[in-house]
Structures are given as C-alpha cells and as structure tokens.
Amino acid sequence: VGSGRELQAPGVPLDAEQTIAWLRGLIAVFGLALLGSTNGLWWPVGDFPVVPWIDFGGPLALDHALAWALVLSWLGVLAATVLQMPSLIRASSIISILSLTGCILLDQHRLQVWAWEFLWLQVFLTFGQPQAALLSSRLLVVGIYFYSAVSKLDAGFVQTQGPWLWQGLSRAMGLASIPWGAKASSLYLAFPLGELLVAGALVLRRSRRWGIGLSVGMHIILLLALGPWGWQQRPGVLLWNLFF
C-alpha cells in the first residue's frame, strides 16, 4: 500500500485523511463482525417478530437482500481503501448507509446502539468535509458518553445496574468475596462519573489525549465486567465496547 497521498484532497492535512481512512476501515471491520454476531436480527427466518418502523408489507427476502448489500458494501469499503480507489470508497459508503437505513426501517430491533452510531459516523465521513467530519464524529462520541452517564445518575442505577456491573468486575478480578459495605454505593457511581469525565476531556483539545486514555481504561474495565471472566455477555456487546 502506498503512503496514502493519492487519496489526499487539496488543502486537507494528511493526518485528517488518514484518520478518516482508519475510521472507515474500523467501521467496516467491526460492522461485519457485529452483523455476524447478531445475524438473527439481520437475516430473520420468521421465528422472531419483526417490528417495522414503516410497514412495507415486503417479504423477508427484502431484509436478507439489504443485509447482504450491507455486507458487500463494507467489504467494498475495505477493498477500495487498500486499493486506494476514492470513488469506490464513496460509492460503497453510500450503499452501506442506504442498506443500513433500510434494514433499520424494516425492524425496530435493529436500532442497536452500534448500528445507530455507525450510521451517523458513515454519514459524517461520507458527506462532510474532512475536518468537519472528524469534529462531528467526535461530538457524536462525546454525546453518547454524556447521555450514557446522565442516564445512570439515578437511584435505579445505584440499586440495580451499578451493583450488577460491580459484581461482574469483582468476579473478573477475583474480588467477589470481599465485603464492600457502605462504600459500594460510591463505587457504583464511579461508572457514570467516569463517563462524564471522559466526555469532558474529549471536548477540549488540551485534555483530549487524557480523554482517549481514560476512555480506553474505562472500556477495558467494562470488558472485564461483561466478558468471559465477568458476566459472559454476548459477543455483540463485547465487540461494540472494543470498537468504542
């Protein structure tokens, strides 16, 4: 593969183009992996209710066709990136946006967090100017962290989800037998407060590197809590956390 300068637009810093190329590639790779790990949602066989946003009355073959179009378009993005074919990258990206939108419209269950995120990231990267696309993508990620944190700042999280996450992390780290007592509630709140800290750090240029580091650390903790040494969640949950 060449240096990537062939794909650089006039007046656009090379690092912005490289970042966008990396993002496109990661979306395609993780998108394919997530489709595979949740394949029952995307290639239904009639044993699970389909709840369309707009009822076209179409056959399940339409769902299958759109899902395969999504697979092929993401493969096209990867191939075109390696071969340095900007026009094919753009065409494949547009097809993936349309296919993913169609899949979601045909079944509300497909509006997974990762699918929603990937859809908007692709829109920004495909139709925005490089710098604006990266800024929009960053703000989307910050918004997800912020919303996730705020939604956890209530009694429900402290009483249910917080203890559940902490138990998974304790299992993974071999600390399940330790009695935490009254300190436990403050430990549970570390999850949303950590997300708020990451969101704030990612907004400011000076603290962005720290924000990225904190984000990586936070997702390692979540992978421990949710992974095979913790609560043994499904691959789709772990893959999305790994991407994020």
Task: Locate each region found by the language model.
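Alpha-helical membrane-anchoring segments
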Residues: 2-244
